[in-house]
Regions:
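Non-catalytic interaction/clamp surfaces of large macromolecular machines
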Residues: 1-16
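Short linear sequence elements within intrinsically disordered, low-complexity coil regions
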Residues: 6-9, 23, 68
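Phosphate-handling DNA/RNA-contact segment within nucleic-acid enzymes
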Residues: 26-169, 182
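Phosphate/diphosphate-binding loops
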Residues: 175-182
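Short beta-alpha connecting loops at secondary-structure transitions
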Residues: 170-174
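Short acidic/histidine-centered micro-motifs embedded in hydrophobic/aromatic stretches
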Residues: 4, 21, 47
Length: 182
């Protein structure tokens, strides 16, 4: 994942600020680790960290060989994850997000809000960008009031969340079909 971050010119400091990490290619590395910590498999399922293989009936990690983006709540507590595939040949799905859980509803959260909130309030403006890497790049270059929706659309719930901090919003989505759709 370091090569990918280097290609995108993301510094180590920025990667640490956003608590970026990576998952191994193993099928059940996280599952085995959490088992040693006495975490119940049902809790792992409920939190979207593992799933049950339809082929084998065994627990498998949801995120394998991915650059990991921890998703924080308004206070910065990690409530979910987004993962970007590192090896394009290992999965057709470029991005994979945690499912909705008792702690996380993607339509009610904004990526990076816990890091951007003070700046948003200070400048009385937020900038909505398209995705994880857009937020990270903005922050790296001093645009610390950038946030992103967690999905393909900006929802009314996300709007209400943002309006607790400012009513001034700029939108900067990509010019591709996904950005236009969002």
């Amino acid at each position: 994942y370091r090569d990918y971050l280097q290609q995108r010119q993301i510094t180590r400091e920025t990667a640490e600020k956003f608590r970026l990490g990576a998952t191994p290619n193993g099928w059940d590395s996280l599952y085995q680790f959490l088992k040693t910590k006495k975490i119940n498999p049902q809790e792992m399922l409920d939190l979207g960290l593992v799933s049950v293989s339809q082929k084998t009936g065994r627990y498998v990690d949801r995120f394998r060989q991915r650059l990991m983006f921890p998703i924080g709540d308004e206070k910065g507590n990690i409530i979910a994850f987004g993962g970007r595939i590192i090896d394009k040949e290992s999965s057709p799905q470029k991005y994979l997000n945690s499912p909705d859980t008792p702690l996380f509803h993607k339509s009610r959260n904004l990526y990076g809000l816990h890091l951007a909130r003070n700046k948003i309030r200070n400048v009385d403006q937020a900038i909505i960008v398209e995705g994880y890497m857009d937020v990270i790049s903005c922050h790296q270059y001093g645009i610390n009031n950038a946030v992103a929706p967690l999905g393909t659309a900006f929802t009314p719930e996300q709007g209400k969340l943002l309006m607790r901090n400012t009513y001034q919003v700029g939108i900067s989505f990509d010019g591709d079909s996904a950005g236009v759709k969002a």
